[in-house]
Amino acid sequence: FKMKLSYINNEYFQKLISIEIDPKVKNKLISDMCRINILHMICCAGSGHIGSSFSSIDLMNWVLGEINKNHENLYFFSSKGHDAPALYNSLIAYGKLDFSFLNKLRKIDGLPGHPDVNTPNIFTNTGSLGMGISKSKGIIKANRLKGIKSKVIVLTGDGELQEGQIWESLNRVSQENLNELIIIVDNNKFQSDRSVKITSDLNDLESKFKSFGIETISCNGNDVNEFSKAFETLEKSNKPGILIADTIKGFGVSFMHGDKLEEGEFYQFHSGSISQDVFDSSISELSKRISDLTEKHNLDFKIELSNYETPEISLSSNKKQSLLASYSKSIVSLAEQNEKIVALDGDLILDTGLIEFEKKFPNRFIECGIAEQDMVSQAGSFAKEGFIPIVHSFSSFLTSRPNEQIYNNSTEETKVIYSGFLSGLLPGGPG
């Protein structure tokens, strides 16, 4: 199969950046232009995260396009990492990454699926979630020792706030007067599978952050009129700041908007690629909005899309075998035979095949959110109480982050089963 794609060439970004217009209008135009190229990039790769890229691109472009002008040493990076296609396209738009990388997401000698320091103007690797604020603190303190004035802006996700390291890292931010720091929360209300509220509700985020003594503002993170004022207020405060950016997952393409889903419904554009029809509809909607905005402001600026056809991909076999489907049936069958089996999940119910288990045994399905250490320790107690807990996550998360908790469980000489998915060197579909 192959796809017929469209993208916006670099010359249009450079022309728009050079035009003297209201920065807010420029932000809207560049962000929608980036959304077109994000879709192109992800479809070329066959994998990527559209929803979180679309929710955060407006904020990224404001930081790199406007806030960057006021700081000689600005560090800006993403802690959540899923929005790498957005970050790459924002860097490309502002000349910080070569345009030739547009077709090279998840390719050898191209751009990695998550940010990596071997990519120009990427300051930190984004691995498991929760590390970004800690890394920001280290950057600030190191620059202070060197006598260099810096500004550090780190973008986190709302699902990411379920990781314990986030709350450890906030403890001394105010105490140490880290006024160089601004933390952005892309509060798009959805994570890998379902809404944050259902998975692991964060409740009153603003009050939580303020309890750490950190200046905190909430605003619409997809409305440049709101978040530009919020950034200005935080910068003038001369205190460490947190911007809770209330965004919409998939913002920019109406049928991708997460806020239209029913309670408990799965979001379809978190990871992976899209069909030709979905691509065409998305490009049409984005192109029209760009055209309408340029006409509204009487801009001498018209975009012509460039076309690109992906190489033909021949599948070696038409027979598909799904290990996930087999696993799903097997764990349900085992649970039917043994009422002591419980399944614990770390916000990966789709990718670990637990949907049928949850439907059939809702009381024996334990959703833990993005909190592997908590999940593993809960499993240890289930085992101590005579149950057979089966713990589910991606192997890369399950083998390292809760290693001490796994060790502790093993010293209790109980039976806990750890089921790790997507082991291996090559990236899986979810990215």
What positions do the PLM features span?
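Cofactor-binding active-site loop characterized by glycine-rich and histidine/acidic residues
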Residues: 38-41, 53-175
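Glycine/aspartate-rich loop-and-adjacent alpha/beta segment that forms the canonical ThDP
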Residues: 4-10, 208, 224-312
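N-terminal capping segment at the start of a domain
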Residues: 31-47, 186-188
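Short acidic, glycine/serine/threonine-rich loops at helix termini
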Residues: 88-91, 164-167, 193-197, 229, ...
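Conserved thiamine diphosphate
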Residues: 147-148, 197-230, 412-431
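Short internal beta-strands
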Residues: 76-79, 180-187, 191, 344, ...
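Non-catalytic terminal/interface segments that mediate subunit docking, oligomerization
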Residues: 294-389, 395-396
